């Protein structure tokens, strides 16, 4: 039962991380101030 809970949480955090990463990756294109930090 513990393994099932761990696998479910890992999948949820995996998709959540992809969503957050995709949101932050598309953010600099809209905000010029974010591009200054990358340089």
Swiss-Prot record:
Annotated protein name in UniProt: Photosystem II reaction center protein I
Lineage start: Bacteria, Bacillati, Cyanobacteriota, Cyanophyceae, Synechococcales
Source organism of the structure: Synechococcus sp. (strain WH7803)
TM stretches of this protein: 6-26
Pfam families: PsbI (PF02532)
Quaternary assembly: PSII is composed of 1 copy each of membrane proteins PsbA, PsbB, PsbC, PsbD, PsbE, PsbF, PsbH, PsbI, PsbJ, PsbK, PsbL, PsbM, PsbT, PsbX, PsbY, PsbZ, Psb30/Ycf12, peripheral proteins PsbO, CyanoQ (PsbQ), PsbU, PsbV and a large number of cofactors. It forms dimeric complexes.
Keywords for the protein's UniProt record, in alphabetical order: Membrane, Photosynthesis, Photosystem II, Reaction center, Thylakoid, Transmembrane, Transmembrane helix
GO cellular component, one term: plasma membrane-derived thylakoid membrane
Domain of life: Bacteria
Function comment: One of the components of the core complex of photosystem II (PSII), required for its stability and/or assembly. PSII is a light-driven water:plastoquinone oxidoreductase that uses light energy to abstract electrons from H(2)O, generating O(2) and a proton gradient subsequently used for ATP formation. It consists of a core antenna complex that captures photons, and an electron transfer chain that converts photonic excitation into a charge separation.
Chief location bin: membrane
Membrane topology (UniProt): Single-pass membrane protein
Subcellular location: Cellular thylakoid membrane
Family per record: Belongs to the PsbI family.
GO biological process: photosynthesis
């Amino acid at each position: 039962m513990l393994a099932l809970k761990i696998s479910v949480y890992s999948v949820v955090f995996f998709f959540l991380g992809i969503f957050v990463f995709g949101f932050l990756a598309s953010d600099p294109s809209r905000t010029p101030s974010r591009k200054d930090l990358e340089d």
